[in-house]
Amino acid sequence: MPKSFIIFLIISALSLTASAQISQTNTDFRFPLDLKPSLSGAFGDLRPNHFHSGLDFRTNQREGYPVYAIADGFVSRMRVQIGGFGQAIYLDHPNGKTSVYAHLCAFHPKIAKLVKDFQYRLESFEVDVPLIFSELPVKKGEIIGWSGNTGSSGGPHLHFEIRDTKTEEALNPQMFGFKVPDVSKPEIRGIYLYQLNGEPFSEDTPKQYFAVKGAAGTYSLATTPVINLSAESAFGIVAFDRHVPAGGTYGLYKIELSLDGENIYTATWNKFSFDANKAINSHLDYAALKKTGMSIQKSFVEPGNALGLYHTQQSGIIKLEDNELHELVYKLSDLAGNTSTFRFKVKRNMSSYASEKSSSLKNYTFNEDFRFNNTDVKLLIPKGALYSPISFEYSLGTKLPGTYSQQHRIHRQNTPLHLPCTLSVKADANLKPELRDKAVLVDQRGVSQGGTFENGFVKSEIKNFGTFHIRVDTIPPKITPMNINDGKTMTGISRIVFKIADQLSGIATFTGKIDGKWILMEYDQKTATLWHRFDEKTLPGKHQLELSVADKKGNTSVYKANFNL
C-alpha cells in the first residue's frame, strides 16, 4: 500500500470559523449527528483482535449526513487510510479530550483542500497529518465533514470516539453524555468452569459448560444444583447487552463476580489503551472463539494481560479451603443502569483435590524472550508476546507442490499472540537466485506473511502461530479498467474507475499520471476499486493516462490509455 506520512506543520492562515478564540471552559458536548441516536456498535464491543473503541452511530444505511463538532476545539489531526478509519478527523478540546470522527465520505471543504494539498505534495493517497498548534479552530455544532463508509467500514455509519488527549486512551463516550435509549437488561447464555490446578491457562485447560435459565435480569443454573470445584478453579461467562428499542447485541459495561459477598473479579469498560487492546484475545477464551465462534469472557486474568479493565483478588482464581457450600454471584451492568444477577452454589471436590498435580511442562514464560532454532527454522518470541507460559511445540510437515520449503508447524494456531514473532524458514536449493526476492512465507490458509531472503532463509514477522512454508510471487497485479479505454471521450464523466487485485503478496503501491504528472488515485480496499476524480488540474482536450500498480514483491502492471476530456 502507499506509504503513510506523518508531517508536523504549522498552519498560519487557515480557519474554519471567524472565531479567533476557543472557550477554555467548554465541557458540554453535543451529538455529532442531527439524527435520533441509534447504535450499531458500542464501546467495548467484542471485535476480532480488539475491543471496539467508540460508538457506531447508524445513518439509515446512507452516506452523506453532516457531521458536527461536538464542542469548541481545533483540528489536531487529519487522516486518510486505505483501511482502518478511512477518512477521519481528530479534534482536540480545551477540557483535555479528543473527539474522533471516522469513515467519513468527505471532509469540510477547507479541510479537504488541505488534505488534498498534502496528498499531492507527498504523492500519496494515504496521509496522516497532525497539527502542532491550534490554527484550525472549530466551534461547537460546526460541520466538519459528512458521514460515509470509507476504510474498513462494513456499511454506512459514523464511528465516533472520545480519547484522553494526553494519554491517547480510548474513553467510553457514554460517560460523557452520549447515551442512547436502553431499557434492556444484560442477557446471560451460560457459564464455563475452568479447572486450572496450578497450570497456566491454555486451550488444553479442562472446562465444563453449565446452562442457565432465567430472564429479566434474574438467572440461575438450569439443571445442576451445585458446581464442584477443583483445587484452583475459575469461570467464564457468555453474555451480552441489548439496546431496546434499537435492537442488536452489544458489549457489557461491567462484569462483577463475588464469592460469598466478596468481590473477586471486576471488569469495567471505562477506558483502555490501544497498545493493550489486542489483549481481548486473553480476555476471551481464544481457542473456543476460533473453534466454535463462541465468545466466552473469562472471569480471571492471565499474567500477561495488560488491559487496565480489571480489579481482582488472586486474578479471579478460586481456591476453596473447606467443604462447605459457597455462593458465587455474577452481576452484569450496562451504562443505562440495567443490571442482571446470576447466583449459583459451589463446593470443592475432594476427590479431584487428591489427584491434581502440576505437570511443570511449561518451558517458556511470557515475560522473557524465547528462541527456538534448528537447521530449518529460526524463531524469536519476544517478551510480552504471550499472555501465559506455554510448552512450545514444533513439528515438520511434508512439502506441498509448488513450494520451496517443507511445512513448519510453529506451536498452536489457537494460542494468541499479543506481539509479532520473527520467523525464518530455510529455503530449498531449488529457490534460484532470480526468485529469492520474490519469496514469501505463507500460512496454512494460503495467506502471505511477506518476507525477505537472508542467508538461505526467508524471514518475516508473523502475527499468529500456525503452519508456514515458502512460496514465490512472480505474478503482477491485475488492472481492470471499468469505464475507460484507449481513445475514449470522457466528457461528462466525473471519474476514471479501475478494479485492481493481486494473487499472493498483496497490493503495495499504485501510481496514476495524466500527461506525465502525478494524480490522486483513491482506493477502496473493500471493493478493490481505484479511481481518479477529474478536477481543475485536467483541462479539456487530449490526454494520456498511465496507471502503475505494484505488489509487495515488486511485480508491476502498467495500464495506458489516451482519452479526450
Model-derived regions: residue spans:
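Bacterial Sec-dependent N-terminal signal peptides
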Residues: 1-27
